Regions:
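Catalytic tyrosine of NAD(P)H-dependent dehydrogenase/reductases that use a Tyr as the general acid/base
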Residues: 4, 12
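Rossmann-like NAD(H)/NADP(H) cofactor-binding core
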Residues: 25, 30, 88
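Active-site helix of classical SDR
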Residues: 7, 15
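C-terminal helical subdomain
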Residues: 13, 31, 50-81, 85, ...
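Alpha-helical segment proximal to the catalytic Tyr-Lys
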Residues: 20-24, 83
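Short C-terminal tail/terminal secondary-structure segment
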Residues: 75, 86-106
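Short, flexible catalytic-loop segment of classical short-chain dehydrogenase/reductase
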Residues: 33-44
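Conserved catalytic loop/helix region of short-chain dehydrogenase/reductase
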Residues: 1-3, 26, 41
Length: 106
């Protein structure tokens, strides 16, 4: 987990540094930090229905994300509507990082 956390932090720091370096050339640099999403890779590993339900419950929105959700975020950052956004990390996780793990009522 140490290598994963360190590399994720490095990508975020690199995004900010590159935004500063390339901003004067009108080049925007942003980062997308996806949360757990349902993809063909997950499907091929035969994630159990219970596992998928646990991931859905971890989302504040109560839905399961897909690769399309990540793609839509990237498309937004590439669009003219994001012309004033640079050096930012857009977390696309349905709010999963806003709260701790889902708990069963006691």
């Amino acid at each position: 987990m140490t290598a994963y956390s360190t590399s994720k932090g490095a990508v975020i720091a690199l995004t900010r540094a590159m935004a500063v370096d390339h901003g004067p050339d009108s080049i925007r640099v942003n980062c997308v930090a996806p949360g757990p999403v349902y993809t063909p890779m997950v499907y091929s590993r035969q994630m159990s229905p219970a596992g998928r339900e646990a991931r859905r419950k971890a989302s504040v929105l109560g839905i399961e994300g897909t690769g399309w959700d990540i793609g839509y975020a990237v498309r937004f950052l590439l669009s003219a509507e994001a012309r004033y956004i640079t050096g930012q990390t857009l977390v696309v996780d349905g709010g999963a990082t806003l709260v701790g793990p889902a708990r069963e009522p006691s």
